[in-house]
Swiss-Prot record:
One of its GO terms (molecular function) is argininosuccinate lyase activity. It comes from Nitrosomonas europaea (strain ATCC 19718 / CIP 103999 / KCTC 2705 / NBRC 14298). GO terms for cellular component: cytosol. This is Argininosuccinate lyase. Belongs to the lyase 1 family. Argininosuccinate lyase subfamily. Its main location: cytoplasm. The keyword Metal-binding does not apply. It is an enzyme of class 4 (lyase). Pathway: Amino-acid biosynthesis; L-arginine biosynthesis; L-arginine from L-ornithine and carbamoyl phosphate: step 3/3. SUPFAM superfamilies: L-aspartase-like (SSF48557). The keyword Membrane does not apply. Gene3D superfamilies: Fumarase/aspartase (C-terminal domain) (1.10.40.30), Fumarase/aspartase (Central domain) (1.20.200.10), Fumarase/aspartase (N-terminal domain) (1.10.275.10).
Length: 461
């Protein structure tokens, strides 16, 4: 094949304009599908030989040629040509140069439409498996840190105001639970990714006696796509993955926001290792939490990719349209960003320095045991709404004295309810508050440790 000649140029009277060639080419980004394109081509060629569509000698030549191409790509010696448009035609051009007529037969019973859909599914299946492993790694880091901090007391917040004492380990376990659901969603998404489009050809199937089940088995697909139009035209599997990725990034963005707050000297709850921070070009004292900030920022980009893919597909008639070429860059960047974020996060949390005393003092400053006092009154027979009102008045009184509820005298507390006795001070301690939530899902250290054991049992060894 001539270098500048297109595989489809037979019915055209003039060459493609240079600007159009650059505008429509995808080789600048879809080259990363090369390994999956080769895998799909090998399986397709073996099926063609098994069904008698090509000869065994053709298959041998194709296998040898694709092996050489794979090696050239791995060594960086493969010549990617813009005029060949995409990864598929670049590989076919080289294969034909190496094998002659055998290479020209490879595309029998196949279109680039079902070819690229297969490549993307193979790529995404691998990416999902890698991302799930990275999620598990991060979960183990969270569990290790939660175990170390099971009895560390921090203020729990609502509306970013001190609400009730919680274990820092319990707080970290909340993110483990989010990631657990994230992993489950990806596992479920993988089922719909793992279906074979090859055999759908351009849109209507093929008149050749292909064995789609053979190809599916060789490539590790659970099933074939059962409608040829759907197989080549939809990208809902990629959209679903990007939705899963957006949820993961949203969860990590929430944790990032907390790390940024906790690192602020006004909180002083944690320190990030220097390797995850940067300084200021003008302020010598600055240690900026760039990694959490970028996670927060990159979450917006991942959300944008999801919307881009939804918008890409929303008005396309069946079947394949060139619009679908625009599916790859958002998908690739989503995969890359998510993998990098999970990898960095596991390392960053593993080196987190915790300041338990700062957390404790923050809990003491916010009347975090006020609900415990209300519950104490209820257990003494006071209706909850009356107890709520009495404690609200007690908090206001403590504020006027610039002290915590636990620092008020018994006489002071009895101003607000005569049922209060000396035992009230047991429930007004931070430790007492934690211990009282001793039920599954609660923040008592004992429950936190049991939750960690249960969580470990659910993760792969």
């Amino acid at each position: 094949m001539e270098k500048d000649k297109k595989t489809w140029s037979g019915r055209f009277s003039e060459p493609v304009a240079q600007l159009v060639q650059r505008y429509t080419a995808s080789i600048g980004f879809d080259y990363r599908l090369a390994e999956y394109d080769i895998q799909g081509s090998l399986a397709h060629a073996r099926m063609l030989a098994a069904t008698g569509i090509i000869q065994p000698a053709d298959l041998a030549a194709i296998e040898q040629g694709l092996a050489q191409i794979r090696e050239e790509i791995s060594k960086g010696e493969f010549e990617w040509q813009l005029e060949q448009e995409d990864v598929h035609l670049n590989i076919e051009r080289r294969l034909t140069a190496l094998t002659g007529d055998a290479g020209k037969k490879l595309h029998t019973a196949r279109s680039r439409n079902d070819q690229v859909a297969t490549d993307i599914r193979l790529y995404l299946r691998t990416a999902i498996d890698e991302i799930i492993d990275l999620i598990h790694t991060l979960q183990y880091v969270l569990l290790d840190l939660a175990e170390q901090q099971a009895a560390t007391i921090m203020p729990g917040f609502t509306h970013l105001q001190v609400a009730q004492p919680v274990s820092f380990g319990h707080h970290l376990l909340a993110y483990h639970e989010m990631l657990q659901r994230d992993g489950q969603r990806l596992q479920d998404c993988r089922k719909r990714v793992n279906q074979l489009p090859l055999g759908a050809a351009a849109l209507a199937g093929t008149s050749y006696p292909v064995d789609r089940a053979m190809v599916a088995y060789e490539l590790g697909f659970d099933d074939i796509c059962h409608n040829s139009l759907d197989a080549v035209s939809d990208r809902d599997f990629a959209i679903e993955f990007c939705a899963c990725a957006a949820l993961i990034m949203m969860h990590l963005s929430r944790l990032s926001e907390e790390l940024i707050l906790w690192m602020n000297p006004a909180f002083g709850f944690i320190r990030l290792a220097d390797r995850f921070c940067t300084g200021s070009s003008i302020m010598p004292q600055k240690k900026n939490p760039d990694v959490p900030e970028l996670v927060r920022g990159k979450t917006g980009r991942i959300n944008g990719h999801l919307v881009a893919l939804l918008t890409l597909m929303k008005s396309q008639p069946l079947a394949y349209n060139k619009d679908n070429q625009e599916d790859k860059e958002p998908l690739f960047d989503t995969v890359d960003t998510l993998k990098d974020t999970l990898t960095i996060y596991a390392d960053m949390l593993a080196g987190l320095h915790v300041n338990p005393e700062a957390m404790r003092q923050a809990a003491l400053r916010g009347y975090a045991t006020a609900t415990d006092l209300a519950d104490y009154l209820v257990k003494k027979g006071i209706p909850f709404r009356d107890a709520h009102e009495a404690v609200a008045q007690a908090v206001r009184f403590a504020e006027s004295k610039a002290c915590d509820l636990s620092e008020l005298s018994l006489a002071d507390l009895r101003q607000f309810s005569e049922v209060i006795e000396q035992d009230v001070f047991e429930v007004l301690t931070l430790e007492g508050s934690l211990q009282s939530r001793n039920h599954p899902g609660g923040t008592a250290p004992e429950q936190v440790r049991e939750a960690i054991c249960r969580a470990r049992s659910q993760l792969p060894g």
